[in-house]
Amino acid sequence: VALKDPAIDMDLKLNTNDIGFKEILSLIPAIYATEFSSLKTDGTATLTATAKGILQGDTVPAFNIDMQVKNAMFRYPALLAGVDQINISANVQNPGGNIDLTTVNINPFSFRLAGNPFSLTATVKTPISDPDFKAEAKGVLNLGMIKQVYPLGDIELNGTIDADMQMSGRLSSIEKEEYERIQASGTIGLTG
């Protein structure tokens, strides 16, 4: 890292060895603040990141961030169930220059909540000016089961989301109610 007032010229690399999934969960305030010491976890995660170039004003260096979570799980011992088979492959990259050139890819983010599998894939481009997205979701989420895997206190959740859908388009099309410009297929069912 070189300070070239008013810019910063950087050439950074980060590569973690396998780290425990509990260390990743500790970064999520809602989980860390709720009986974190008793939380049982398994699975590993890796993180690699690079950044090379100039950071000045609206100009960003080229960067690439990869996160992998493999076969992870968490469970609060006082609760009936847990979340397992957690797998995440995520990448955020930018060729440098404009932050709006950033691309986010998540393929997959999958898990099993109290025995029900759910998976999501997503890609987002031009996240600042007009997010261009493509997403796919498949699985069943029984919202009432969340209380069995996470201590919600007095909060009650009910209902089921059953999804097998794909969607792509731009946020501006939704904001302008130009729904014909959004590509969508599949089904999503909401009950309860």
Model-derived regions: residue spans:
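Membrane-proximal interfacial segments on either side of biological membranes
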Residues: 1-109, 116-192
